[in-house]
Amino acid sequence: MRIAILGRPNVGKSSLFNRLCKRSLAIVNSQEGTTRDRLYGEIRAWDSIIHVIDTGGVDQESTDRFQKQIHQQALAAAEEASVLLLVVDIRCGITKQDEELAKRLLPLKKPLILVMNKADSQQDLQRIHEFYGLGISDMIATSASHDKHIDLLLERIRQIAQIPVPSVEEQDAVQEDELPSEEAAISLHAFADETLFENESLSQEEASFLEELVAQTATPAPVDRPLKVALIGHPNVGKSSIINALLKEERCITDNSPGTTRDNIDVAYTHNNKEYVFIDTAGLRKTKSIKNSVEWMSSSRTEKAISRTDICLLVIDATQQLSYQDKRILSMIARYKKPHVILVNKWDLMFGVRMEHYVQDLRKMDPYIGQARILCISAKQRRNLLQIFSAIDDVYTIATTKLSTSLVNKVLASAMQRHHPQVINGKRLRIYYAIHKTTTPFTFLLFINSNSLLTKPYELYLKNTLKAAFNLYRVPFDLEYKAKPARKSN
């Protein structure tokens, strides 16, 4: 079931949206027009998921150049949803915009709840009778900012959706012993086998205990959920246009003015029976270019989108040089260890330029580009758009492939035979054991004799060896080390 939240500007729609979804997804600000696109979230309750759509404030008398598109987005959300919430400001009484919206929504013959928001005091509640004139029988007074009567609204939504309240089941009296955490068990892998350390051994009791812990550690099953893909880039490079072109509909408001997108907009899409969630982000600006609190929050949300996405699509403008902001975004993607693809948009404007030469030159401009997958596309002409899906799938498949422990150890053993570590103070680095610890982020854990014997050049050699062996040129990864604990003297 889908619920659309509609209303004129600044009545608290985004605050209500955040309260229902129990997380701050929409930017909340007293400035009118903060929300422009449709923003999607979820209510997770009663063992069910209800999708919620936040829309921009509708005001046909506004001179805002985006208002026509905001109006179209709101009406599209109303058509898409099965339940409608018309939000009004109880303190203002009925306005002309409220009346116009009610007249638009009532003929849709869908369940319609009038949410009289900002009912912060008992005095506000005394104005409920004023709203009978809108002709909406289902009315609930709320205060989203103070979390008042949100439970009543949720209960009404549950009733309309005909979701049964889950029965309380008796808890099993027998509780299973808690297994060791994956991190704790992983750290013991190198010590579970007596043969790992030459001339050193564990007691039989210690070895049996550690082997049991290691046996209980299983590779977690892959998460069965849509793949999250964030489009990142500085303002006005065409991120929203790319999403609209992929979906073949105007899901995101576009304009030549930088900063059109403010919220992070999650857009679900299915391609070849595979589910994706594209996250359209606000463009990252230079700090001195951020003029107000809304733009600051938009830039902050962009970084949060990078942190929560599975893969990043960095969008750059083919007609412009790689900018400081592009390089800043690349370093941010690298810091979060996110697999990524670079989309060079507006290729339709590049005349007389050979694509392979452009790509070669682009790789030389920043070390973080390296061997990243680069696609030259045109959202305007829909050129090479389908290649985006194959690029996403190829890179993400490599980034989430769990490597076998035996194969990782064979690769490292061969590397050490080809190129021995240097001797430091009469000792040489030894790698006893290695595992592929995690895929997100992609991390190897190496058990060694001493951190002091690992030099930076040799670490780079090991990293390049693993990169070549497992085709990790397009996947950022880390090496972690765990040194053998010092033996206790009797």
Swiss-Prot record:
Gene3D superfamilies referenced in this protein's UniProt entry, alphabetically: 3.30.300.20, P-loop containing nucleotide triphosphate hydrolases
List of residues binding GTP 2: 233-240, 280-284, 345-348
Domain KH-like residue range list: 401-485
A GO molecular-function annotation: ribosome binding
InterPro entries: G_ENGA (IPR031166), GTP-bd (IPR006073), GTPase_Der (IPR016484), KH_dom-like (IPR032859), KH_dom-like_a/b (IPR015946), P-loop_NTPase (IPR027417), Small_GTP-bd (IPR005225)
A GO BP annotation: ribosome biogenesis
Domain of life per record: Bacteria
Domain spans labelled EngA-type G: 1-165, 227-400
Keyword tags: GTP-binding, Nucleotide-binding, Repeat, Ribosome biogenesis
Residues the record lists as binding GTP 1: 7-14, 54-58, 117-120
Role: GTPase that plays an essential role in the late steps of ribosome biogenesis.
Quaternary structure and interacting proteins, as annotated: Associates with the 50S ribosomal subunit.
Similarity comment: family membership: Belongs to the TRAFAC class TrmE-Era-EngA-EngB-Septin-like GTPase superfamily. EngA (Der) GTPase family.
NCBIfam families: GTPase_EngA, small_GTP
HAMAP family: GTPase_Der
Record-given protein name: GTPase Der
Organism expressing this protein natively: Chlamydia trachomatis serovar A (strain ATCC VR-571B / DSM 19440 / HAR-13)
Gene symbol of the encoding locus: der
